[in-house]
């Protein structure tokens, strides 16, 4: 009986030690946050909260220059005030959020008179990606591009 228990213990120990991460810190990176620099923190906070639909989370500074939003488990969007003016951004550099229904999201944009377009830049148009995902793009108050899609793996 003792030999059987010892054999099981040694087998388990071997399997644990075979794992390369045993005894080492996990160094594989994961997304923690994305930060954007904005002109008017109140305007941008309202936009990301009310238009995009993100939830605010506590931020540690309490200095009136930061708003943090939850964007995924353990991942955040940090909105930081201090920019002197909005800047021009290429559409290829964008934030992307998935929603259950692009059509319902478009209703929110239309109600608030927020212009959106497809990838080609056609106003009030939707891109239908080759894999069936619907996409639209619009800008935040500081000119950052935002993509909204209905990527099904998110829901």
What spans do the regions from the language model cover?
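Mid-chain, structured segments of secreted extracytoplasmic proteins
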Residues: 66-111
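Vicinal oxygen chelate
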Residues: 40-42, 95-142, 153
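Exposed loop/turn and edge beta-strand positions of beta-sandwich/beta-sheet ligand-binding modules
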Residues: 63, 91, 132
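N-terminal beta-strand motif that seeds the catalytic metal site of vicinal oxygen chelate
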Residues: 21-42, 93-95, 154-155
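Core segments of cupin and vicinal oxygen chelate
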Residues: 36-76
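Bacterial Sec-dependent N-terminal signal peptides
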Residues: 1-26
């Amino acid at each position: 009986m003792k030999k059987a228990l010892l054999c099981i213990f040694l087998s388990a120990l071997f399997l644990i030690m075979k794992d390369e991460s045993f005894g080492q810190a996990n160094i594989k990176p994961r997304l923690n946050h994305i930060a954007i620099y904005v002109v008017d923190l109140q305007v941008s906070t309202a936009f990301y909260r009310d238009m995009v639909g993100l939830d605010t989370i506590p931020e540690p500074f309490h200095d009136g220059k930061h708003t943090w939003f939850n964007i995924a488990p353990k991942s955040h969007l940090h909105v930081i005030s201090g920019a002197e003016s909005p800047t021009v951004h290429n559409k290829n550099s964008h934030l992307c959020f998935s929603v259950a229904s692009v059509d319902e999201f478009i209703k929110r944009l239309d109600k608030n008179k927020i212009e959106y377009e497809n990838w080609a830049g056609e106003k009030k148009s939707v891109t239908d990606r080759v894999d069936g995902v619907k996409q639209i793009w619009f800008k935040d108050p500081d000119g950052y591009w935002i993509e909204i899609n209905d990527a099904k793996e998110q829901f």
